[in-house]
Amino acid sequence: MRLLVCDTSDKNCSAGIFEDGKEICYELSFESKTHSETFMPLVHIVMAKAGVKHEDLDGYAVTVGPGSFTGIRIGVAAVKGMALAAGKKCIAVSSTEALARSCENATMTPKNETLIVPAIDARNNRVFAQAAEDDTLKALIPEDAYDADALTEKISKIPEVIYGKRRQILVVGSGATVMKKAFEKAGYGLNIYYAPGAAIMPKGVAAAAFAGKELIDARDLKASYCAVSQAERLKKNG
Protein backbone atom coordinates (compact mmCIF):
# COMPACT_ATOMS: atom_id res chain seq x y z
CA MET A 1 0.00 0.00 0.00
CA ARG A 2 1.36 3.38 -1.05
CA LEU A 3 0.44 6.36 1.11
CA LEU A 4 1.01 10.09 1.17
CA VAL A 5 1.58 10.83 4.87
CA CYS A 6 1.14 14.35 6.23
CA ASP A 7 1.46 16.33 9.45
CA THR A 8 0.50 19.93 10.19
CA SER A 9 -0.44 19.54 13.85
CA ASP A 10 2.49 21.38 15.47
CA LYS A 11 5.02 24.12 14.63
CA ASN A 12 6.62 22.19 11.75
CA CYS A 13 4.85 20.47 8.90
CA SER A 14 5.81 17.53 6.72
CA ALA A 15 4.78 15.25 3.89
CA GLY A 16 6.17 11.97 2.62
CA ILE A 17 5.53 8.98 0.41
CA PHE A 18 5.73 5.55 2.04
CA GLU A 19 5.02 2.13 0.55
CA ASP A 20 4.21 -0.82 2.83
CA GLY A 21 5.87 1.05 5.67
CA LYS A 22 9.07 1.82 3.75
CA GLU A 23 10.16 5.39 3.12
CA ILE A 24 10.35 6.52 -0.51
CA CYS A 25 10.90 10.21 0.21
CA TYR A 26 9.80 12.98 2.55
CA GLU A 27 10.14 16.71 3.13
CA LEU A 28 10.03 18.81 6.31
CA SER A 29 9.38 22.51 6.74
CA PHE A 30 10.85 24.40 9.68
CA GLU A 31 10.04 27.80 8.17
CA SER A 32 8.33 30.58 10.09
CA LYS A 33 5.67 30.81 7.39
CA THR A 34 2.19 29.47 8.11
CA HIS A 35 1.23 25.92 7.21
CA SER A 36 -1.24 27.35 4.70
CA GLU A 37 1.77 28.66 2.77
CA THR A 38 4.12 25.70 3.15
CA PHE A 39 2.06 22.51 3.27
CA MET A 40 0.81 22.09 -0.31
CA PRO A 41 4.21 23.02 -1.82
CA LEU A 42 5.70 20.22 0.32
CA VAL A 43 3.12 17.80 -1.06
CA HIS A 44 3.97 18.81 -4.63
CA ILE A 45 7.70 18.35 -3.93
CA VAL A 46 7.39 14.83 -2.49
CA MET A 47 5.01 13.72 -5.22
CA ALA A 48 7.48 14.94 -7.84
CA LYS A 49 10.47 13.36 -6.07
CA ALA A 50 8.66 10.03 -5.82
CA GLY A 51 7.45 10.27 -9.40
CA VAL A 52 3.85 9.53 -8.44
CA LYS A 53 0.49 11.12 -9.13
CA HIS A 54 -2.54 11.09 -6.88
CA GLU A 55 -4.07 8.25 -8.88
CA ASP A 56 -0.98 6.15 -8.05
CA LEU A 57 -1.66 6.37 -4.31
CA ASP A 58 -3.70 3.90 -2.30
CA GLY A 59 -4.64 6.53 0.25
CA TYR A 60 -3.66 9.42 2.48
CA ALA A 61 -2.62 9.44 6.14
CA VAL A 62 -2.76 12.63 8.18
CA THR A 63 -2.39 13.63 11.80
CA VAL A 64 -5.82 14.77 12.98
CA GLY A 65 -4.74 16.14 16.36
CA PRO A 66 -4.46 17.07 19.04
CA GLY A 67 -2.17 20.04 18.51
CA SER A 68 -2.38 23.39 16.76
CA PHE A 69 -6.03 24.05 15.99
CA THR A 70 -5.23 26.07 12.88
CA GLY A 71 -2.62 23.60 11.67
CA ILE A 72 -4.92 20.63 12.12
CA ARG A 73 -7.72 22.35 10.22
CA ILE A 74 -5.35 23.09 7.33
CA GLY A 75 -4.00 19.54 7.13
CA VAL A 76 -7.32 17.75 7.50
CA ALA A 77 -9.06 20.01 4.97
CA ALA A 78 -6.24 19.69 2.43
CA VAL A 79 -6.00 15.91 2.71
CA LYS A 80 -9.76 15.52 2.58
CA GLY A 81 -9.85 17.63 -0.58
CA MET A 82 -7.06 15.64 -2.26
CA ALA A 83 -8.64 12.32 -1.32
CA LEU A 84 -12.10 13.29 -2.54
CA ALA A 85 -10.69 14.56 -5.84
CA ALA A 86 -8.69 11.36 -6.35
CA GLY A 87 -11.41 9.02 -5.10
CA LYS A 88 -9.12 7.62 -2.40
CA LYS A 89 -9.55 6.80 1.29
CA CYS A 90 -7.80 8.24 4.33
CA ILE A 91 -6.20 7.13 7.57
CA ALA A 92 -6.60 9.33 10.65
CA VAL A 93 -3.48 9.33 12.84
CA SER A 94 -3.20 10.57 16.42
CA SER A 95 -0.59 13.31 16.73
CA THR A 96 0.73 12.01 20.05
CA GLU A 97 1.02 8.47 18.69
CA ALA A 98 2.88 9.77 15.64
CA LEU A 99 5.20 11.72 17.96
CA ALA A 100 5.87 8.63 20.08
CA ARG A 101 6.56 6.50 16.99
CA SER A 102 8.88 9.21 15.65
CA CYS A 103 11.04 8.68 18.75
CA GLU A 104 11.21 4.88 18.71
CA ASN A 105 14.64 3.53 19.65
CA ALA A 106 15.48 6.82 21.42
CA THR A 107 15.32 5.36 24.93
CA MET A 108 18.34 4.74 27.16
CA THR A 109 17.03 1.45 28.57
CA PRO A 110 16.09 -1.81 26.83
CA LYS A 111 12.69 -2.04 25.19
CA ASN A 112 9.81 -2.66 27.64
CA GLU A 113 11.46 -0.68 30.46
CA THR A 114 10.50 2.87 29.44
CA LEU A 115 7.34 4.92 29.73
CA ILE A 116 7.18 7.30 26.77
CA VAL A 117 5.22 10.53 27.18
CA PRO A 118 4.63 12.36 23.88
CA ALA A 119 3.61 15.89 24.86
CA ILE A 120 2.62 18.84 22.67
CA ASP A 121 2.62 22.30 24.26
CA ALA A 122 -0.94 23.60 24.61
CA ARG A 123 0.09 26.78 26.50
CA ASN A 124 -0.94 27.97 29.97
CA ASN A 125 0.79 25.01 31.65
CA ARG A 126 -1.23 22.54 29.59
CA VAL A 127 -0.15 19.80 27.21
CA PHE A 128 -1.76 17.44 24.74
CA ALA A 129 -0.29 14.14 25.79
CA GLN A 130 -0.55 10.47 26.58
CA ALA A 131 1.70 8.03 28.45
CA ALA A 132 2.44 4.70 26.81
CA GLU A 133 4.63 1.62 27.03
CA ASP A 134 7.61 2.15 24.72
CA ASP A 135 7.50 -1.36 23.26
CA THR A 136 3.78 -1.82 22.61
CA LEU A 137 2.64 1.83 22.69
CA LYS A 138 -0.26 0.67 24.84
CA ALA A 139 -1.62 3.83 26.45
CA LEU A 140 -1.47 3.74 30.25
CA ILE A 141 -2.79 7.31 30.33
CA PRO A 142 -5.07 8.11 27.37
CA GLU A 143 -4.52 10.94 24.92
CA ASP A 144 -6.13 14.16 26.11
CA ALA A 145 -5.48 17.76 27.13
CA TYR A 146 -3.91 17.85 30.60
CA ASP A 147 -2.74 20.38 33.14
CA ALA A 148 0.99 19.59 33.39
CA ASP A 149 0.95 19.34 37.19
CA ALA A 150 -2.04 17.00 37.15
CA LEU A 151 -0.40 14.84 34.48
CA THR A 152 2.82 14.45 36.46
CA GLU A 153 0.77 13.22 39.41
CA LYS A 154 -1.07 10.74 37.20
CA ILE A 155 2.23 9.44 35.83
CA SER A 156 3.69 9.01 39.32
CA LYS A 157 0.73 6.78 40.23
CA ILE A 158 1.01 4.38 37.29
CA PRO A 159 1.66 0.92 38.82
CA GLU A 160 4.37 0.14 36.26
CA VAL A 161 6.21 3.29 37.38
CA ILE A 162 5.66 2.70 41.11
CA TYR A 163 6.95 -0.87 40.99
CA GLY A 164 9.84 -0.19 38.64
CA LYS A 165 8.70 -2.09 35.55
CA ARG A 166 8.99 1.17 33.62
CA ARG A 167 12.16 2.46 35.24
CA GLN A 168 12.75 5.32 32.82
CA ILE A 169 10.36 8.03 31.67
CA LEU A 170 11.03 9.74 28.34
CA VAL A 171 9.09 12.94 27.67
CA VAL A 172 9.27 14.02 24.03
CA GLY A 173 7.93 16.94 22.01
CA SER A 174 7.25 20.64 22.39
CA GLY A 175 5.53 20.04 25.73
CA ALA A 176 8.64 18.49 27.32
CA THR A 177 9.82 21.82 28.77
CA VAL A 178 6.45 22.38 30.46
CA MET A 179 6.51 18.84 31.83
CA LYS A 180 10.08 19.26 33.10
CA LYS A 181 9.04 22.25 35.21
CA ALA A 182 6.06 20.32 36.57
CA PHE A 183 8.12 17.25 37.48
CA GLU A 184 10.84 19.36 39.11
CA LYS A 185 8.22 21.21 41.17
CA ALA A 186 6.61 17.93 42.26
CA GLY A 187 9.92 16.33 43.25
CA TYR A 188 8.88 12.71 42.71
CA GLY A 189 12.47 11.54 42.28
CA LEU A 190 11.72 9.64 39.08
CA ASN A 191 14.28 8.78 36.39
CA ILE A 192 13.15 11.17 33.65
CA TYR A 193 14.71 12.26 30.35
CA TYR A 194 13.42 15.11 28.22
CA ALA A 195 13.60 15.70 24.47
CA PRO A 196 11.90 19.06 23.80
CA GLY A 197 13.38 19.19 20.31
CA ALA A 198 11.69 15.95 19.24
CA ALA A 199 9.08 16.46 16.55
CA ILE A 200 6.57 14.48 14.56
CA MET A 201 8.41 12.93 11.63
CA PRO A 202 6.92 11.38 8.50
CA LYS A 203 8.23 7.97 9.62
CA GLY A 204 6.15 8.31 12.80
CA VAL A 205 2.99 9.15 10.87
CA ALA A 206 3.68 6.26 8.50
CA ALA A 207 4.39 3.80 11.32
CA ALA A 208 1.08 4.70 12.95
CA ALA A 209 -0.78 4.49 9.65
CA PHE A 210 0.63 1.07 8.77
CA ALA A 211 -0.04 -0.28 12.28
CA GLY A 212 -3.44 -1.60 11.31
CA LYS A 213 -5.29 1.71 11.14
CA GLU A 214 -8.58 1.68 9.24
CA LEU A 215 -8.93 3.28 5.83
CA ILE A 216 -11.99 5.52 5.99
CA ASP A 217 -14.03 7.50 3.50
CA ALA A 218 -12.54 10.96 3.07
CA ARG A 219 -15.87 12.51 4.02
CA ASP A 220 -15.56 10.88 7.45
CA LEU A 221 -12.12 12.35 8.17
CA LYS A 222 -12.43 14.58 11.23
CA ALA A 223 -10.11 16.57 13.47
CA SER A 224 -9.53 15.45 17.06
CA TYR A 225 -8.83 18.60 19.06
CA CYS A 226 -9.16 17.25 22.64
CA ALA A 227 -9.93 20.82 23.77
CA VAL A 228 -11.87 23.94 22.87
CA SER A 229 -9.77 26.51 21.01
CA GLN A 230 -8.98 29.88 22.59
CA ALA A 231 -11.10 31.66 19.97
CA GLU A 232 -14.06 29.41 20.78
CA ARG A 233 -13.58 29.95 24.53
CA LEU A 234 -13.56 33.73 24.06
CA LYS A 235 -16.66 33.56 21.88
CA LYS A 236 -18.45 31.39 24.45
CA ASN A 237 -17.52 33.75 27.29
CA GLY A 238 -18.69 36.78 25.34
Language-model features and meaning:
Residues 1-64:
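N-terminal beta-alpha supersecondary unit
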